[in-house]
Each structure stands twice: as structure tokens, then as C-alpha cells.
């Protein structure tokens, strides 16, 4: 089957036309404008390609999904999260989880090549596209800070009552998982049922993610993305999923 080539004004083909090998490859071409990305994600499609390749669009079957109700942190992580919850409202706490205070840095860290990998799909062009989408209010970072330093985090796309996880990084033990746990709490507070994990990995499966048939995924997001947007704002995120404003640098609340 010939892979469809998308011009700037060409709509995506139905996801049912995606290839089986490689699984989910649907089309190539088009651009990474906020409008095109919004159209893609709302229909269960995401870009993934190596630098130097044309833009490739994917919709795999099955789709890896983390149901927020099924999030399953390990015993050691649960223990650490309980300890953090006891000190999270202390202004002097060593660890804080924040939202959208260092988006560009999180994106840059996620783009760094991983051990054993020759490169990254988060190319400069992809970074620029998601920075633009972040500026429009649709992409967000959840950040773990330790002693005032960015130690880990993740970023993802938020449409309606649907969250699409993009990438994670950690510079300290459990830093990305702590960010994920706080994100899950925030999403559950706002009736978000699923986090799209895109592709199957053992790491995500150990945290509770499971594959679901693409048809079920598409049916779910059709309803979820039509719901009102979440109340994202920059600030500190607590273990109950509540966002709090950060104090000014001088420590005096305005």
C-alpha cells in the first residue's frame, strides 16, 4: 500500500488505513503547526520521525493507555510519595512538583539522547513546534525540583479532558515518576480518565499502563476532547492534584 502524502491542506486519512507493518504508520508530510497538531491528536494521530526524515504520522493498534485509576506506583515509590505529602506545604521543603515553570528546559532534557540510542526524535523542529503549542496553552510540563534544581519531569498535550504523554526524563531517582504521580492526581481531580502513552513499553506497563484496541481509544478521545479545557496554570502541584501559586522570589505574596 502506498503511504499517503499530505499537503498543507490535505486532511488525515482514516486511522483504519494505517499500516500493520510498521504498526500504525498512517501518512507522511504536512507540517507541525498548532492547527495540524490539534487535528492530529483529536483523531488519535501523533508525529514521530527521525531528524532528516519527512514528518511521519502514526496511529498504532493497540494503543498504550494509562488509566488514571489504574496507576500503580511501586511500594518504594508509594512510601516516598507519602513522605513528600507530609512536607509539601512547607516553604522550605527540599522537593517540589511544579507545572509550567520550566517548559523549555523540560523539553530540552527530554530531547537529550538516551543511553544506547544514537539520537532523538525530539528534533529542533519538533521542539519549536511544541514550544509554540505550549505558548497557545495546549502543552504542559510537570516538573520535579530538588533543592531548587530541576531533577526530572515530563511534558504532554492537553485537549479537553484528555492528556497525551509525550516524554519523560530524570536526573535523580524517581524524579519523573514523582511528576507522573502528581499529574495523575491532578487529572483525576478534573475527571480525566486516560493518559495516552502512544506505544507499548515495559516501563509504562509496570506503572499500570495497558494496551487498548485503537477503535476503543478513538471512541474515548472523541468524547474526551470535546469536554471543557482543564484549568492549567503555572504553579506548585500538590499530592492531591491541587495547583497553588508560587511565592515571588522575595518570598512576599502579592
Swiss-Prot record:
Keyword Transcription, does the record have it? no
Q: Which reaction does it catalyse?
A: N-terminal L-lysyl-[protein] + L-leucyl-tRNA(Leu) = N-terminal L-leucyl-L-lysyl-[protein] + tRNA(Leu) + H(+); N-terminal L-arginyl-[protein] + L-leucyl-tRNA(Leu) = N-terminal L-leucyl-L-arginyl-[protein] + tRNA(Leu) + H(+); L-phenylalanyl-tRNA(Phe) + an N-terminal L-alpha-aminoacyl-[protein] = an N-terminal L-phenylalanyl-L-alpha-aminoacyl-[protein] + tRNA(Phe)
User: Might you report a single GO cellular component term?
Assistant: cytoplasm
Return the HAMAP family for the record. Leu_Phe_trans
* Primary subcellular site in the record, as a coarse category: cytoplasm
Among Pfam families, the record links this protein to: Leu_Phe_trans
Keywords from UniProt, A to Z, are: Acyltransferase, Cytoplasm, Transferase
Q: What is this protein called?
A: Leucyl/phenylalanyl-tRNA--protein transferase
**GO biological process terms held by the UniProt record:** protein catabolic process
Answer yes or no on keyword Cytoplasm: yes
Please give one Gene Ontology molecular function term for this protein: leucyl-tRNA--protein transferase activity
What's the family?
Belongs to the L/F-transferase family.
Enzyme class, broadest EC rank = transferase
- Please describe what this protein does: Functions in the N-end rule pathway of protein degradation where it conjugates Leu, Phe and, less efficiently, Met from aminoacyl-tRNAs to the N-termini of proteins containing an N-terminal arginine or lysine.
Its subcellular locations are: Cytoplasm
> InterPro entries, alphabetically?
Acyl_CoA_acyltransferase, Leu/Phe-tRNA_Trfase, Leu/Phe-tRNA_Trfase_C, Leu/Phe-tRNA_Trfase_N
Amino acid at each position: 500500500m502506498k503511504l499517503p502524502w499530505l499537503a498543507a491542506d490535505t486532511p488525515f486519512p482514516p486511522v483504519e488505513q494505517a499500516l500493520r507493518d510498521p504498526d500504525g504508520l498512517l501518512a507522511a508530510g504536512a507540517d507541525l503547526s498548532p492547527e495540524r497538531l490539534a487535528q492530529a491528536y483529536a483523531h488519535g494521530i501523533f508525529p514521530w520521525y527521525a531528524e532528516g526524515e519527512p514528518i511521519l504520522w502514526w496511529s498504532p493498534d493497540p494503543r498504550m493507555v494509562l488509566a488514571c485509576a489504574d496507576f500503580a506506583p511501586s511500594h518504594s515509590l508509594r512510601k516516598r510519595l507519602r513522605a513528600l505529602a507530609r512536607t509539601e506545604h512547607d516553604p522550605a521543603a527540599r522537593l517540589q512538583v511544579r507545572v509550567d515553570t520550566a517548559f523549555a528546559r523540560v523539553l530540552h532534557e527530554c530531547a537529550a539522547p538516551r543511553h544506547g540510542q544514537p539520537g532523538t526524535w525530539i528534533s529542533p523542529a519538533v521542539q519549536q513546534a511544541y514550544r509554540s503549542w505550549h505558548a497557545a496553552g495546549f502543552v504542559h510540563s510537570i516538573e520535579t525540583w530538588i533543592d531548587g534544581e530541576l531533577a526530572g519531569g515530563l511534558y504532554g498535550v492537553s485537549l479537553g479532558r484528555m492528556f497525551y504523554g509525550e516524554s519523560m526524563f530524570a536526573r535523580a531517582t524517581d524524579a519523573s515518576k514523582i511528576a507522573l504521580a502528581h499529574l495523575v492526581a491532578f487529572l483525576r481531580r478534573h475527571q480525566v480518565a486516560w493518559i495516552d502513552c502512544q506505544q507499548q513499553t515495559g516501563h509504562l506497563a509496570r506503572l499500570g499502563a495497558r494496551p487498548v484496541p485503537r477503535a476503543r481509544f478513538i471512541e474515548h478521545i472523541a468524547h474526551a476532547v470535546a469536554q471543557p479545557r482543564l484549568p492549567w496554570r503555572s504553579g506548585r502541584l500538590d499530592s492531591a492534584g491541587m495547583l497553588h501559586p508560587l511565592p515571588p522570589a522575595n518570598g512576599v505574596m502579592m
